[in-house]
């Protein structure tokens, strides 16, 4: 797989779960002999929601909620076949969204 690059993009609401997942991916890739660039922290997206507390009146009484989406980017340079096999067998925790793209140089 000479001249290829694998880009892995991870998203999660909990940064601790995200960091453990990125650590597992980086360790697996390094163990199989691939070069790793990252994990690169991408900007956190904050979605804010404002909801009325009362179902009928009291417009002034509101409750605010916020959900943060944390993201990380990992590039695997010069992956071997063992790297791809190990990444396919890797079991990541629930709550982590994984996007994998392969590029030719």
Swiss-Prot record:
Gene3D superfamilies, per database record: Ribosomal protein S10 domain (3.30.70.600)
Gene Ontology biological process terms from the UniProt entry: translation
InterPro entries reported for this sequence: Ribosomal_uS10, Ribosomal_uS10_CS, Ribosomal_uS10_dom, Ribosomal_uS10_dom_sf
GO molecular function, one term: structural constituent of ribosome
Pfam families: Ribosomal_S10
GO cellular component, one term: ribosome
Record keywords: Ribonucleoprotein, Ribosomal protein
Coiled coil: none
Statement: the UniProt record of this protein carries the keyword Ribosomal protein: yes
Assembly description: Part of the 30S ribosomal subunit.
Family: Belongs to the universal ribosomal protein uS10 family.
Role noted for this protein: Involved in the binding of tRNA to the ribosomes.
Name assigned to this protein: Small ribosomal subunit protein uS10
């Amino acid at each position: 797989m000479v001249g290829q690059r694998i880009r892995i993009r991870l998203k999660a609401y909990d940064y601790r779960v995200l960091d453990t997942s990125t650590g597992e991916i980086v360790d697996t890739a390094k163990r199989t002999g691939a070069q790793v660039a990252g994990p690169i922290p991408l900007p956190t997206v904050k979605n804010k929601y404002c909801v009325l507390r009362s179902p009928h009146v009291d417009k002034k009484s509101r409750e605010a909620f916020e959900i943060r989406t944390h993201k990380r980017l990992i590039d695997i340079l010069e992956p071997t076949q063992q790297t791809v096999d190990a990444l396919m067998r890797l079991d990541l925790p629930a709550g982590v969204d994984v996007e994998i793209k392969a590029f030719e140089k």
